[in-house]
Every structure is written in structure tokens, then in C-alpha cells.
Amino acid sequence: GLALSFFAKPDVSYYGGSKEQYISVCEPLQKADVAGTSYAAPWIARKLSYLIDILGLSREVAKALIIDSARGWKKKPTPEEVALYGHGIVPIKIEEVIQCEDDEIRFVVSDISEKWNSYNYNFPVPLQDDKYPYVARATMCYFPLCNRLQGVDYTNTELNIHFGRINNEGKLNEI
């Protein structure tokens, strides 16, 4: 449902069935056709369990992959759509969560942030005719400590990301 303008709640959406098209579930003794958002949560939990328990990913990386796969590159949802559906609908096939398209490169960076630390990661970034011939995006996910005294977002930690090239003086030329 609707939350603060800079939050997407829910993070993602999934099929929960409707009276027009039910989903099939396994009840204790038989198959049942049901509808409702509460039936979508186990499907997302199952995908997260696969990413964490089978592939060995951290919960942060698993959540980021789920959100990233729901958002996709071609979708540009309106703020109203994000407020109602989150970042998009998670793909049905787990392969679409863990693999990227042939024209994409996905970097997964995971680290532990300590107080007031800055980190630089070097990725091979092409420069052509003094321009960057690509589109970049980041899906960041973390589970911060929270405190009601921290203001509107309640978190004790904040993350920022900047893309660019480090020049000869060691400074970042942001894109």
C-alpha cells in the first residue's frame, strides 16, 4: 500500500490470484483454487529460500536480485504504480532472477559497512569519444538498525552510490 514518497511498499508484487483467475495451491488433502495477496508471499519466500539456501547468497543479495528482476530495464513505472505494486512483478522462472540478458553485465558487490567508511570498487568502464556508451543502474539492499528517534526513515545507516571514473588526481568524475 501507499507509504512515504521515497519508499516502495511493497518492495515487489507477485501473482496472488483473483476471482477472474485463481491460482492453484496444495491443501492438506487436495488441490485448491484460491485468490488473495497472502498466497503470493509464499511464492516470493520460496524464491528467496532458493537463492539463500541452495545458491548460498546472502539475504541482502537475494533481496536485491528479486527487486532487480522485478524492475527490469524496459519498465518505467509511474510513482503511483510503484506506490501500489512496488518495483514490479517478480518473474515466474528463477532463471530470470539469477541470469541477465545477453546485452547486460551484472556486478554483485557485497560488503559490510562500518561507521563512516567509504569504499571504491573498480569496474572496467569503457570510454568512447569522451563519453560513456552504456546505461548503469544499481539495486542496493541492506537491513539497517532502526531507531524511531532517527527521523522519518528510522534507519541508523545511509548508503550512497556514485558512478564515474577516478581521474589522475584520484578524484571521482561523476557521470
Roles of regions detected by a PLM:
Residues 55-77:
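An often Trp-containing, charged/polar helix-loop segment at the C-terminal end
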Residues 40-50:
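Active-site-proximal alpha-helical segments within enzyme catalytic domains
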Residues 83-167:
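Secreted peptidase-domain scaffold signal
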Residues 170-175:
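Noncatalytic accessory or regulatory domains flanking protease catalytic cores in secreted, cell-surface
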Residues 18, 72, 144-146:
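Short loop/turn segments at secondary-structure transitions that flank enzyme active sites
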Residues 14-16, 66, 140-142:
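Active-site proximal loops enriched in glycine and acidic residues that flank catalytic Cys/His/Asp
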Residues 1-42, 57:
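Catalytic-core environment of secreted peptidases
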Residues 65-69, 80-89:
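A glycine-rich phosphate-binding loop feature that marks nucleotide/adenosyl-phosphate handling sites
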